[in-house]
C-alpha cells in the first residue's frame, strides 16, 4: 500500500495542467466543429442548416464567458437571459453543444500530453494495452477452450453526475474547468436527475458524444482499477489479457475505511484472488471475467467485486449485474452472438494386433451461433415480417425508387451476413435472408400494384440472388484448426471468419437499431 501511495503522489505531481484558458480560444470550437464533420459520427448542431459553423455565435459565447461574475450569476440566477436562454431554443441548443464539444477536446489535452511525455518507470510495470476490438477474436478462439467458469458483468452507470466530475479531479488539477463542467451538467440535467435514466443517457450520447465518451471512459477506467490492483498484488504472474487502468489517489483511503468496517477482510481477499489463469475483457459497457478456477472461487469474486465497487464509488452495485456461467453447460451473450464451449464426444476404434477397443475422446469446441429469436423480433419491429417470421411488405418504402428499395434491403442483408460471419452455423442467417428477400419482392410488387410471382418473373430471381450474396473485399481474420492465423482479402468462405471492420456496424448487436 505504501508503494501504491508513493506512485499515486508521483503521478499527481505531473497532472498540474491548466486548461481553463483554452476555453476562451475561438480555434478550439472551430476544431471541435471540423472534427465533428470529418469524424465517423458527425456532430449535429440544432438549428444550423447543413451543419454550417457560425463563428459569430462562438465569438458571442466567448464574450459572454469573459463577462465579470458571469458564471456566478448564471448559477445563482439560472432563469435570467444569460448564456443558455431557455426562451430561445436555437441559441440554447447551439451554445450547449458547441461548449460541450469544445470542453471535450480541451480536457483530453492533458491526458494526451501525459501519455506522450511519461518517462520510463520500473516501480510499477505497465500492462499490455489491448484497446482494439480485434484482440477479442484471438481471446475467444484460444483462451475459452481452456477455461471453466465465466462471470458476465454489466458495468453500472454512476448514480449521480457529481461522481463523474470527482473522477476527473485526480487527472485535471484545474478547479475552474471542473466548476465549468459542474455548471454545464447542472444546466443539462438540472443536477437532480439520475444518469441511469434512459432519457439522460440518450441525450448525452446523441448531442454531446465527445464529452459523454470522455466522462464514461474515465469512469470505466476507475471502475476497473481496483480489479487490476488487487489482481496484481495477489500474484507474481502478470495479467496480460486486460487493458491498462488508471490509478486514483483516494483508493488507499477507501481501503482503510473498508478495513475498519471489515477487519481482516483484505488479507483473506488476496488469497482468493490468486488465480493465475484469470482473463478479463471489456466491450460495450460490459465485461467478462473467465478463469479455470472453481465455482466457489467465482462466487468469492462476485462478492468482492460488489463490495469493493460499493466502497470505491460510494453507491450500491446490484449483485444481479454479475452473472456466473459454466462454459460447458450454458450459453452466454457476447457481441451479439450466443457463445458456448460444449464438450463433443468422439469414439475412436483402435486396433492393436488381434485386439480392438474403443477410445472415448472428449474435445472442447468454441461454438458461436446467431440468436434467431431476437433478430426475427427486430425484423418484425421494423415491419419486414410478422412476429412469427412471415415476410410482409414495407409500405413506408414504396415511395422510393426500385433501386433504392433494392439497395436498402440488400445493405441490411449484407450487413447481417458480414457481422455474423463468425458464426459456426449459418442456418439462421439463411432464414433472415429469405425473410428480407421476400419482403423486398412484396414491397416492389405493392409499389407496382402487381403480384409477387408476376413481378419476380419480370425482374428475374438471378438478379436478386446475386445482389444479396455479393461480398465486399475487406480485411478479415480467419482461425484454422491448426491454430494458425491467416490474413486475407476475400469474400465468403466456408470457414468461420471474423471481419475486422464489424465495429463500424456494431449497431446490429442492439436489435432495436435495425429499423
UniProtKB/Swiss-Prot annotation:
Listed under GO cellular component are: chloroplast
> Where is the protein localized?
Plastid, Chloroplast
Q: Which Pfam families match?
A: Intron_maturas2, MatK_N
Is-annotated flag, keyword Metal-binding? Answer: no
Q: Which GO terms describe its biological process?
A: mRNA processing; RNA splicing; tRNA processing
Q: Which GO terms describe its molecular function?
A: RNA binding
The primary site where this protein sits is: plastid
Q: Please provide the record's keywords in A-Z order.
A: Chloroplast, mRNA processing, Plastid, RNA-binding, tRNA processing
Task: Provide the disulphide bond pattern.
Answer: none
Q: Which InterPro entries match?
A: Domain_X, Maturase_MatK, Maturase_MatK_N
What superkingdom does the record give?
A: Eukaryota
Homology family: Belongs to the intron maturase 2 family. MatK subfamily.
- Function, in words: Usually encoded in the trnK tRNA gene intron. Probably assists in splicing its own and other chloroplast group II introns.
Q: Which protein, by its recorded name, is this?
A: Maturase K
Which organism does this record belong to?
Sorghum bicolor (Sorghum)
Gene behind the chain: matK
